[in-house]
């Protein structure tokens, strides 16, 4: 009887070769680098959109403040009982609170800086207010004095070159700071503003149609200014040159 012998075979364990492992590592690194690049790009895009959104918000806010203030310029609670707006409080002309002396009867008034960064250009608006009319100043407060005797409220706008901020200071003629909360103290309205330049629209006698815009030093009769053209320089959040925005606002209560 023949006996068949079976020789057991050695079992070989399956595994990765060095080449296969290197290929797998390479693919993994490519995927990792791709995910990292995508994350960085998304993060940079978010930051850019955030900076752009902040810039646009600052532009809208600054122009809203100035537009509302100029629209109120020259306002009287009762035109029949008022002939002029008195401007008896003259702010200093230091860099901390520029302004100059506003002529009586004017709803808007401005001073030029002459190119000196230490004495920024300013824009003033004035209106008569009663405690019951609800007019809000540029710092968010209203006149809290008499309900029958109007006071002159003045908003003074300028740019602080040390902080690149649009500032506003409110004065109430001869009544002190008690007549309006925070009056007399400069307040930051909008950040990221490096410069403000203002031109004033004049019209021929007997006309409301503006035919020229002039610098503040050229205006001789401030109560006849029909429009205000404001140019604001905003700090570019992406570097490079400032972003310039120009807006023209009609003076509603001009003579």
Task: Report the location of each language-model feature.
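Broad, structure-driven detector of short, well-ordered beta-strand segments within folded domains
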Residues: 153-162, 198
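Short linear sequence signals and composition-biased patches located at protein termini or domain-edge surfaces
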Residues: 50, 54, 58-73, 77-82, ...
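Short hydrophobic/aromatic-rich beta-strand segments that constitute the beta-sheet cores
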Residues: 164-170
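Short, surface-exposed coil-to-beta transition loops
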Residues: 151-154, 244
């Amino acid at each position: 009887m023949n006996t068949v012998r079976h020789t057991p075979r050695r079992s070989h364990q399956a595994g990765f070769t060095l080449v296969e492992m290197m290929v797998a590592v390479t693919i993994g690194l490519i995927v990792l680098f791709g995910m990292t690049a995508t994350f960085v790009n998304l993060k940079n895009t978010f930051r850019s959109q955030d900076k752009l959104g902040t810039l646009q918000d600052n532009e809208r806010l600054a122009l809203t403040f100035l537009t509302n203030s100029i629209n109120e310029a020259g306002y009287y609670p009762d035109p029949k009982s008022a002939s002029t707006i008195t401007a008896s409080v003259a702010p200093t002309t230091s860099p901390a609170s520029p302004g100059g002396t506003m002529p009586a009867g004017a709803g808007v008034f401005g001073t030029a800086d002459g190119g000196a960064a230490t004495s920024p250009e300013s824009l003033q608006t004035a209106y008569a207010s009663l405690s019951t009319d609800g007019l809000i100043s540029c710092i968010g407060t209203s006149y809290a004095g008499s309900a029958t005797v109007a006071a002159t409220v003045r908003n003074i706008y300028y740019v602080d070159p040390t902080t690149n901020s649009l500032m506003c200071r409110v004065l109430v003629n001869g009544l002190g700071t008690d007549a309006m909360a925070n009056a007399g103290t400069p307040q930051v309205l909008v950040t990221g503003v490096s410069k403000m330049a203002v031109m004033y629209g004049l019209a021929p006698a007997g006309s409301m149609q503006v035919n020229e815009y002039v610098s503040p030093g050229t205006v001789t009769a401030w109560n006849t200014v029909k429009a205000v053209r404001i140019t604001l320089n905003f700090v570019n959040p992406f570097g490079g040159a400032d972003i310039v925005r120009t807006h023209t606002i009609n003076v509603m209560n001009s003579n």
